[in-house]
């Protein structure tokens, strides 16, 4: 997939989907034509944060043979959105061959999108890694907690050793300031490069903010909040 960004994390609960959604909208506000795909098949929730109620999902592609173009919804700022489907147990574990077929089927999106943002499942599953290895840029979301460090480390270990991925951008979420984000990143980077041939780049910090939490509750991305100037700059 060309011109594509995957947003990943070693564990759930670190704000991965929030960052993927707001990143997609920020890029669209900058004038790019953006598509957002929720690749957490069967357990998707990006549509909730977008305030979109999708009529179809990726299940219709995997199970019913519909082309990807037929399951696209239009979200805020005109972004194109592909839902991963929610509460659909029959697509929780997609076979590897089906994953590759799906990735190939996404290529037609290139004709009307400048960038594809993919929200991939948390953790180092085969599904996550298949998408991670197919995109141009891989963003890892990290928070300053030992469990997040360990799970992100495990994700990078698998991506690097099993899939040959070397370049990772790291976003540190829920920080008090940019200096704190830089410290957390440096500590994590030192732990990773000690053992793996990987390149980690600091992609910035996202502030801990009630406005972000309120936006989630309102089903409205924070970058669309006119009063959330600091939060907008972070994305």
Q: Where is each model-derived feature located?
A:
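NTP-binding/hydrolysis catalytic cores, primarily Walker-type P-loop NTPases
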Residues: 219-235
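Gly/Ala-rich phosphate-binding loop of Rossmann-like dinucleotide-binding domains
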Residues: 28, 132, 160
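Inter-motif core of Ras-like GTPase G domains
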Residues: 108-111, 125-147
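Beta-strand-loop-alpha "switch" segments that mediate conformational coupling across diverse proteins
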Residues: 195-223
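Conserved C-terminal guanine-recognition region of P-loop GTPase G domains, centered on the G4
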Residues: 149-163
């Amino acid at each position: 997939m060309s011109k594509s960004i995957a947003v990943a994390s070693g564990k759930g609960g670190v704000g991965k989907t929030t960052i993927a959604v707001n990143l997609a909208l920020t890029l669209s506000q900058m004038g790019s034509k953006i598509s957002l795909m929720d690749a957490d098949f069967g357990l998707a929730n990006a549509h909730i944060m977008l305030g979109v109620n999708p009529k179809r999902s990726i299940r219709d592609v995997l199970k019913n043979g519909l082309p990807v173009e037929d399951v696209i919804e239009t979200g805020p700022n005109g972004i194109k959105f592909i839902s991963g489907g929610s509460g659909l147990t029959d697509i929780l574990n997609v076979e590897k061959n089906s994953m590759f077929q799906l990735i190939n089927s996404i290529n037609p999106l290139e004709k009307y999108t400048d960038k594809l943002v993919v929200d991939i499942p948390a953790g180092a599953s085969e599904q996550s890694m298949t998408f991670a290895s197919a995109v141009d840029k891989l963003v890892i979301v990290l928070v300053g907690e030992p469990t997040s460090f360990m799970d992100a480390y495990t994700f990078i270990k698998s991506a690097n050793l099993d899939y040959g991925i070397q370049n990772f951008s790291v976003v540190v979420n829920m920080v008090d300031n940019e200096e704190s984000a830089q410290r957390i990143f440096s500590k994590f980077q030192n732990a990773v490069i000690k053992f793996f041939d990987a390149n980690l780049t600091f992609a910035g910090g996202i502030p801990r903010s009630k406005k972000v939490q309120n936006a989630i509750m309102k089903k409205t991305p924070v970058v669309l909040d006119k009063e959330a100037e600091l939060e907008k700059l972070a994305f």
